Amino acid sequence: MNKEEIRNCLSTLYDAQALRIATSNRLFQIFSKETENSDTDIDSSKLNKSILEEYEKITDYKTDKKRSIKATLKDLKDELELIDTEEKFEQVKAYSFLLESEKTYNKLLQKAVEEHPVYTEFLSNVKGCGPLMAANIIAYLDPHKARHASAFFKYAGLDVVISTNKDGEPLTDDEGNLLTHGRSRSDTEEYEYVNKDGETATKKGLTYNPILKSKLIGVLASCIIKAKDPKYSKIYYDYKLRIQNMPKHQNKSKGHQNSMALRYMIKSLLNDLWTYWRTKENLPVTPPYAVSKLDMNPHGFNY
């Protein structure tokens, strides 16, 4: 699969996943009524497992005995606690189909990603980054459009925004420095797009991909820490210790400091990825902002 095909497969997988989750929740509502008089709390995962076990028992019996569903339910009525009608059987059958569809797309996506050079040569070496996470990165990031690593940061929603008051005026600290904050859904901007008539127009909205941001910060970051990736987990802990000892950050909560360190770690990963990917595509590679604009010394895999 090429990049576009991986993106389409990923989108279809998430659509199938959303439908499966919604169906699972509906089944839980239906079948939990069967156990609502129980003295114990109802566990949705255990209930779903029990439903699928009964479904498998019914389908196996139906196939082996060559019986109809109606006859099978009658034969097994003393062994079944949940699926006792044809209507319930058909609902679980549809749910089972969704599960299999999701597994199929997962396998297709995993196979495609494991053959993609960005995964085999770079992302597979990052502990905590599996094929599905890599699929999100490959599908949504484009080195041809990102002339600088900061373009990856912005598209992933990891750039900083100048804080303003209610009148839109920039806020500053006591020393006159501009105050900034991490980009969120409330930080919208005007940008150009091509409308249905093929004309360039402007509209106000998000300038980043919220799905990619949630995957990178909400999933990948914690996976890297848990997997103890030798490079990026060290970047996280070093930066966290650094900001804990900086006067301007000492009053921030531990959660805030942790979020800052996670963002810094993911940005370091994206910077390295951008450098690798642009080089792979024979595209120009520029030094990081800290090197080119702030005259800081380069380090690691900067360029």
Annotate the PLM regions.
Residues 1-115:
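Long, charge-rich intrinsically disordered scaffolds of nucleic-acid metabolism proteins
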Residues 4, 8-11, 15, 86, ...:
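Conserved aromatic-histidine-acidic binding/catalytic patches
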Residues 4-25, 29, 135-140, 214-222, ...:
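Short, hydrophobic/amphipathic alpha-helical patches that form generic packing surfaces
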Residues 5, 43, 48-49, 238-245, ...:
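Amphipathic alpha-helical surface "interface" segments used
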Residues 41-51, 176, 182, 198, ...:
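Extended non-catalytic scaffold regions that mediate assembly and binding
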Residues 101-143:
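Coiled-coil termination/hinge junctions
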Residues 122-123, 137-259, 263, 276:
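Phosphate-backbone recognition surface of nucleic-acid-processing proteins
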Residues 253-290, 298-301:
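Basic, amphipathic alpha-helical segments enriched in Lys/Arg and hydrophobic/aromatic residues
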